[in-house]
Structure formats: C-alpha cells, structure tokens
Amino acid sequence: MNRTEAREWVVKMLYQYDVSKLPLEKIFENFYEEHDPGEQKEYIEGTVRGTVEHLEEIDREIEKYSKDWPLYRMPRIDLAILRCSMYEMLYGNIPVSISINEAVEIAKKYSTDDSPSFINGLLGAFVREKGLEEGEANDN
C-alpha cells in the first residue's frame, strides 16, 4: 500500500467514525481483517487518531473557511477529506501542496462534481491565511 492509498483509507475511516461513531479500535480491526497496510500502518493510525483527537479545533478551522456553509450541510465525505488534510497541514510532516492535491484527487474519486473545487478553495484560503508555504511541511 502506498501513501496515496493509505490517505484514502484514512478518509474512509474518518468517514466511518463520523457516521457510525464506532470506536477507533473497531474501525482499525475491520480494516485489518481485509487489508494489509504494511509500512503505512503508523501513518494511518497516527493520522486517524490525531484527527479525532483534534477534531474540535479542525472543525472550527473548516467552519471559519467554509463561507456560510455549515458543517452539518457538507457531504460527510467532504468533511472527512477536509479533516484529514487539515490535520496533515497542522500537525503532520506532509508538504502542504501534496496534502491539498491529494485531498482534491480523493474528492474527485469519492464525492460530488462540485467538491474538488470547494475543497481546493477552502484549503487554499486556510493555507494563505495561516501563512503556510505551498510546498513546505509543517514543523509541528
């Protein structure tokens, strides 16, 4: 499994957590029954756990940049994509441009026709206001 596939699974797990409220351990268990994450296991679990741990802060940031589009009206998959990308940019060591590009690609694959541009615009505004450089990784 490569990092792009792992990121897709992070989004799927965050989506499942959001809609089912299953404990994270059960979500991981279900995933490992059918998939071998290989060397991506640490990234997957760390990103899912970290996103859930910082969910309130991440959701506040998403609401701030969503321009009159409350979280409860967003497609749940878009919310999972945004949460994953914001977590990576705030707490991960992933270059900003990669995180945004992958978020847009996941949206193209799993969400509505309007979602990629919405996600790109929201994440772009977040990066500009936070002063994050397009290509740099966060030092947190």
Curated annotation (Swiss-Prot):
MF terms per GO, please?
Answer: RNA binding
Asked if Transcription is a keyword of the record, the answer is yes
SUPFAM superfamilies recorded for this chain? NusB-like (SSF48013)
Keywords in alphabetical order: RNA-binding, Transcription, Transcription antitermination, Transcription regulation
Tell me which Gene Ontology terms the entry assigns under biological process.
DNA-templated transcription termination; transcription antitermination
Q: Please give the GO cellular component terms listed in this UniProt entry.
A: cytosol
Tell whether DNA repair is among the UniProt keywords. Answer: no
Q: Which domain of life is it from?
A: Bacteria
Transmembrane feature ranges: none
For this chain, the family text in UniProt reads: Belongs to the NusB family.
Function statement: Involved in transcription antitermination. Required for transcription of ribosomal RNA (rRNA) genes. Binds specifically to the boxA antiterminator sequence of the ribosomal RNA (rrn) operons.
Protein name, please?
Transcription antitermination protein NusB
